[in-house]
Amino acid sequence: MTQKTQLPNIYQNFKGGILHPFSPGIGKMTLSPELIAYLLKGMEASTEDFGQNLAGVIKSQPAFLENTGQRVMKEVGKFVLDFAGAGVISASVGIYAMDFKTMESVCVDGWFVDQKEKEYNPMHSHINCQMSSVGYLEVPKQIAEPEDKWDSHGCIEFSYGTPTTMVCTGVMFRPKVGDFYVFPSWLNHTVYPFKGEGHRKAFSMNFSIREKNDQS
């Protein structure tokens, strides 16, 4: 099916002011203590290695257990759908909106990341999905509370666009237990290594948006 250009509608909608239609969004919410505890137990129990599917230079990346994705979706599913809906509105400058009654977010796959000293994730993006995410379960003190607030050790950085004036092409977040980020699957991101003891424990999930099953 050929999609008609949005140009005429955008032109008519934009009456004046300042327009920022190009930047991809990043969503953030806070996970419940109960879900964090559940995921930490699942991380310890998982014996399947998911690392062979990933770009990370990280030894321990266990796969989700059978029901883990469903449990997480009970808490984050609506937020993921809201994030997708906000993207539709932003990309179309308010012309189009998602019909939340007929659509749902689904987990494509998920895995844990048990990062240790000197391990890292190179710049990469995700495939076979529409959105990706990361949630933090345990963070070493030297990452959470660094002596130098500009220290990037253990941080995640997202990168997009061509470096030039008046444009932000990179944004960095310091991991905090309970923080959960959602972003477009094609958005490049990297995780920096850190020094010292401790484990930087996190999980990642990929999502897609689809029409609801009539029986759901």
Report residues per predicted region.
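Non-heme Fe(II)/2-oxoglutarate
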Residues: 2-100, 111, 118-121
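Catalytic core of non-heme Fe(II) oxygenases with the double-stranded beta-helix
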Residues: 105-182, 190-192, 199, 209, ...
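Aromatic-acidic/polar surface patches that form glycan- and anion
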Residues: 69, 73, 126, 196
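C-terminal "cap" of GNAT-fold acetyltransferases
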Residues: 201-203
